[in-house]
From Swiss-Prot:
Record lineage: Bacteria, Fusobacteriati, Fusobacteriota, Fusobacteriia, Fusobacteriales
Assembly information from the UniProt record: Monomer.
Gene Ontology cellular-component annotations: cytosol
Localization annotation: Cytoplasm
Protein name: Phosphoglycerate kinase
HAMAP family: Phosphoglyc_kinase
Annotated positions binding ATP: K208, G296, E327, G354, G355, D356, S357
Endoplasmic reticulum found in the keyword field: no
Positions bound to substrate: D20, F21, N22, R35, H58, L59, G60, K61, R118, R155
Length: 398
């Protein structure tokens, strides 16, 4: 077991906390503050325990000097200050005397945030490649380290693994958000209430191979939608018209279907159109009758009903990836239907594994109907694959 924040003595300590404040921005304004809100319980806990808090995060990718102008965390510090109802000192540096002196002048109960960790990527990708000197330097700025950024836990960066490895034995822990992610996703996969129904969507089988292989040994049924369904349907010998397909993954899809012993459930109908756009004529056909000149862009009503019949029986549901082209209203009905089916469950643990399916549930107003909506897209996927997450692995054991 990894240490959690409640295992650390924080009194009067300088607490380095890696958060995931990689929020969407438009014209310098934050368009969705969910990730900041999710970190508040851990932040408040630190402040209530008489500590000095030093926060940092990445924001987008920083490839050229010009990126700095649109990738500063200044607006995030201002938003956090507003949400906390207290001043957050922002230091627009990632190292140096100005930052060090601001940290040394912090009093217990005060908050400082320093600049986007990926500004360090401009000079040889020091953050993303976990430069040992950078990890050591950042670790030297505090007494203890808390990692509450689940979204980057599947990456070994200087700001998570680098600090954890250099902060000293027993001085690192995960925050409440990471603890919650590990608990819900971990239990759903490794010790689920049954039946466990997994619903996987999205465009590519290649993104989900590891997840399907891991879940084949653990789930009772795996319902497959999204464009990746066409690789499976073609593997079964069906004509899929001009639908998106990964031809180099057909053998793998055949193999997964053969291994699945009926656990994998494929769509029985699909919504088709002649082009990948919303304002176009569309119709629904059975998967055996897809014309040569049409492409499937969503699961059909019969499939929604079929999937619903499995979802209704579930005691645990894990959902990752939309059922169709959710951003186009004519091809969003499958995702909406599945989302509603899961939201209607009253006696089940329901988990959304981040990314587009989380956005769908939130935009449909169903966020509070799910047991847990993950904050990490790639990290959730790797965790569902049964992989070790470097950002968690580097944390002190209890």
């Amino acid at each position: 077991m990894k240490k959690i924040i409640t295992d650390l003595d924080l009194n009067n300590k300088k607490v380095l906390m890696r958060v995931d404040f990689n929020v969407p921005m438009k014209d310098g304004k934050i368009t969705d503050e969910n990730r900041i809100v999710q970190a508040l319980p851990t932040i408040k806990y630190v402040l209530e325990h008489n500590a000095k808090l030093i926060l940092f995060s990445h924001l987008g990718k920083v490839k050229i000097e010009e990126d700095k102008a649109t990738k500063s965390l200044k607006a995030v510090a201002e938003k956090l200050s507003e949400l906390l109802g207290k001043n957050v000192t922002f230091i627009p540096e990632t190292r140096g005397e100005k930052l060090e002196s601001a940290i040394n002048n912090l009093k217990s109960g005060e908050v400082l945030m320093f600049e986007n960790t990926r500004f360090e990527d401009l000079d040889g990708k020091k953050e993303s490649k976990n430069d040992s000197e950078l990890g050591k330097y950042w670790a030297s700025l505090g007494d203890v380290f808390v990692n509450d950024a689940f979204g980057t836990a599947h990456r070994a960066h200087a700001s998570n693994v680098g600090i954890a490895e250099n902060i000293g034995n027993g001085n690192s822990a995960v925050g409440f958000l990471v603890e919650k992610e590990l608990k819900f996703i971990g239990e759903a996969v490794n010790n689920p209430k049954r039946p466990l129904i997994a619903i996987l969507g999205g465009a590519k089988v290649s993104d989900k191979i590891g997840v399907i292989e891991n879940l084949l040994t653990k789930a009772d049924k795996i319902l497959i939608g999204g464009a990746m369904m066409f690789t499976f349907l073609k593997a079964e010998g069906k004509n899929i018209g001009t639908s998106l397909v990964e031809d180099d993954k057909l053998d793998l899809a055949k193999d997964l279907l053969a291994k699945s012993n009926g656990k994998i459930v494929l769509p029985v109908d699909t919504v088709i159109a002649s082009e990948f756009k919303n304002d176009i004529e569309f119709s629904t056909v059975d998967v055996d009758n897809i014309p040569n000149n049409k492409m499937g862009l969503d699961i059909g009503e019969k499939t929604v009903t079929l999937f619903d019949s499995y979802i209704k029986t579930a005691k645990t549901v894990v959902w990752n990836g939309p059922m169709g082209v959710f951003e186009m209203s004519n091809f969003a009905k499958g995702t909406i239907g599945v989302c509603e089916s899961i939201a209607n469950l009253t006696d089940a643990v329901t988990i959304i594994g981040g990314g587009d399916s989380a956005a769908a549930a939130i935009s449909l107003g169903y966020a509070d109907k799910f047991t847990h909506i993950s904050t990490g897209g790639g990290a959730s996927l790797e965790f569902l694959e049964g992989k070790v997450l470097p950002g968690v692995e580097a944390i002190s054991n209890k």
